[in-house]
Amino acid sequence: MTSESSPLLHYRLFSVSDGGLGPPDSSPIMTDAVTVGTGPTQRKLSTFFGVVVPTVLSMFSIVVFMRIGFVVGHAGLLQSLLMLFVAYVIIWLTVLSVCAISTNGAVQGGGAYFMISRTLGPEFGGSIGLMFYLANVFACGVYVLGLVEAVLDVFGRDPSDVTDSLRSLPQGYGYSFLYASIILLLCMAICLVGASIYSQASFFIFLLVFVVLLTILISFLAVRPLTVSIRHGGNVTMTGVYTGINSSTLHNNLQADYSLDYTTGNLMNFATVFAVMFNGCTGIMAGCNLSGELKQPSRSIPMGTIIAVIITFFVYLILFIFTAFTCDRTLLREDYGFFRSINIWPPFVLIGVYATSLSASMSTLIGASRILHALAKDDLFGVLLAPAKLVSKGGNPWGAVVYTWALVQLVLLAGKLNTIAGIVTVFYLIAYAAIDLACLALEWASAPNFRPTFRFFSWHTCLLGILSSLVMMFLINPAYASGSIVLLLLLLGSIHFRSSSSSWGYISQALIFHQVRKYLLLLDVRKDHVKFWRPQILLMVSNPRTSSQLIRFVNDLKKGGLYILGHVETGDLDTLPSDPVQTHYSFWLSLVDKLNVKAFVDLTLCPSVRQGTQHLLRITGLGGMKPNTVVLGFYDDACPDDYFLQDSLFTPGLSPKDDAFGVDATSLQAHFPPARDPETPRLLSAKDYVSMICDALKMHKNIVLARNFPLLVRPEASSSSPATYIDVWPLDLLRPQASAYVDVCSLFLLQMACILNMAASWRRYQLRVFLCVESRGGSDGASGWLAAEAKFRELLSKLRIRALIRVVAWDRVAAFRVQNMGGQVLNREPISSEYLNAAKSAVTDEGGTETAVRFLYLPRPPADSSLHERYLEELDTLTSGLGPTLLIHGLTPVTCTEL
């Protein structure tokens, strides 16, 4: 499976068009599962036939002939022009975004859905794509119902006029649904033949429509004033007046005068009228939806869409102005088909109405089917859209056409054009906002590969397009707008939880990178302050199979800080054909996902583990985010447990996060080597291990040694566990007289324990601090203990650390202490095993079985490397059998008592 790291394009080194220079088994180039080969192409449409013609016809639709009077009659010329301007500003802003995205790479079938999904990712793309598809479905229903309305307006039976033989078609809800179904069936038949026959039919209709528009303009100038009889059924009759070019008529038509819509009986307002008018501008995606049939979609979509928008804007503008100059309010508001009554030859307008409505219906039906087919191919909705994958031998997605036809049939049940116009407008607006959002995201991400050839846009136009679309959604119909957003969120969640990772690229990653880089540059290490210190941890991992418990525990220890998993592969790059580390990253990242830890991964290749650790200590991190604390597993002879065999997360088929970016549980099991056999020679010697501790201290890193963590019972899985304490021993148990309770290392120890106690899963545990006090045989032994406890309690209060204080009598242990000389401990002298065992017994006895994890003071390793093994043996004796234990040595001040 491809992943996000896959290249965007796969280049072939051989030509496939030069007559045989390529290899005989040349296969088509594959990009995002779309084949771009040398066989016969299905891309046949040019800019004019594939974009300009369908876009113009879709934007005109029924509105240009049947709703001009509706808009001007209710809103007046001034508000009509305002509506036109607002609508085209929104349209134009979206067109700029469409042009930018479509000229930034090859556009495949699916149009707007393809552009959104390949920019914003599958969740957002699939959600908006489905809603844009539904918008086209509803729009198709609007256009078909508009055509039925126009037919019945002329040929519908009128009981009050039995002498008119033309008006013979029965009227009523059932008959309207029947007529609409017949028209829709005709549209489906044309779309089933294919895009080629559709483009030919559209061009013929295009010519026809412009001839009709020309006759309308001529009629405005040539027809003399007349009175028009208006009938709404029954015996209701009224008259409207066509005055010709008249300034008084213009004056009367300037202001708005909203009244009842005679088709629905609802009172009109600015929002409802704008919804109907805007529906006549929403066809800008008609050419984009046919991107799979265009010869050069990246060139045709921007050029053709811009030309179509300019043409329709001026046609609407001219019609609004001439209508306001020539027709009175009654004619405009009571007869939406008044163009026919004032035309030099009335049948011309009928032809135009029927042609545009039929063309818009076909355009939205075929466009919706292409969107649905693209959605089905991407398999975002599973078996629900499986029938839409069916295609003919010629590549026509007939399954998607039939599927869409069935949904439009359901829309036709609404019965009235204006009833569903608001739904169409809201769905189109949310799709336009998504297009603008996609372009805005690309612009803000500043990705080097976003360099569209169309440059007449900016983030300002994208943002303005988003805001204007969202505002108009709620102005048109708050209920529909709210419902559409709820639907969008539901679809987002559905696709997110059921879809697997895609190879389309994630714009979120580009945006995150852009923001992280910006803030990393602002993160200045020179401004660090102890008040805002946080752990930035590098955990060195030999094999995740044996370290998973520790990886999870350190995740609780980071407290919002940096957490990096470091690993050293031993080897010499000079002897290898390629760097093996590069292929390992995906497995380590999947491990991080499986364990649900917030960690980065850093791998390196070195001849030795010690050298690799030095490299990671130096170069891991970036800017102000570099590790200040190193965690190492303890070096002992214990037989490591294979955690992968115990946790269901790593059992194939049982993990809820299986198959993340192509790495499933089986792959993880196979990638990481088995747990080390006790008889197998180790890659790291005891001497090198202690030297790594020295290296970390020399680099001014705090050091933590973790032992016995396979025995750790995690808090969330142990509600009934008796372990309820986090124990802290802030004194160097190996050399008590060489340290103090308030030195930097002791305070660091307290800070780390406090951080663990602040983690959500560890809050129910009680922090417990042990003070080792000797009576020294004096008479004031008890008072000395009390004074030591009071002094330490005051320190904890200043540090705002809540903890129990336990005073431990250290006299018995001190009796086994190594030789003292003048109060100085002789580091070269070995510490007796009796003392170490006595100290361990004291730690065990005082803590009991209720201790979950212990924090102990880690003394510095001896400077003499010959003593390193003895140093490790002392630590081994002290901590053997203690349970989960952290040995910590801190170098940096991390506590503050002031505000």
From Swiss-Prot:
So which stretches are on the Cytoplasmic side?
1-44, 102-127, 198-202, 288-304, 369-393, 441-469, 761-899
Kindly list the biological process annotations in GO that this record carries: cell volume homeostasis; chloride ion homeostasis; chloride transmembrane transport; potassium ion homeostasis
Q: Which Gene Ontology terms of cellular component type are present?
A: lysosomal membrane; plasma membrane
Q: Which residues lie on this side of the membrane: Extracellular?
A: 66-80, 149-176, 224-266, 326-347, 415-419, 491-739
Q: How does it sit in the membrane?
A: Multi-pass membrane protein
Q: Where in the cell is it found?
A: Cell membrane; Lysosome membrane
Q: Could you list the residue ranges forming a coiled coil in this record?
A: none
Q: Name one Pfam family in it.
A: AA_permease
Q: Which GO terms describe its molecular function?
A: potassium:chloride symporter activity
- The membrane spanning regions, by residue number, are 45-65, 81-101, 128-148, 177-197, 203-223, 267-287, 305-325, 348-368, 394-414, 420-440, 470-490, 740-760
InterPro entries linked to this entry: AA-permease/SLC12A_dom (IPR004841), SLC12_C (IPR018491), SLC12A_fam (IPR004842)
**Coarse class of the protein's main subcellular location:** membrane
Residues bearing glycans: 235, 246
| Keywords (A to Z) from UniProt | Cell membrane, Glycoprotein, Lysosome, Membrane, Transmembrane, Transmembrane helix, Transport
Function as written in the Swiss-Prot or TrEMBL entry? Seems to correspond to a subunit of a multimeric transport system and thus, additional subunits may be required for its function. May play a role in lysosomal ion flux and osmoregulation.
Q: Which family does it belong to?
A: Belongs to the SLC12A transporter family.
- Protein name (record): Solute carrier family 12 member 9
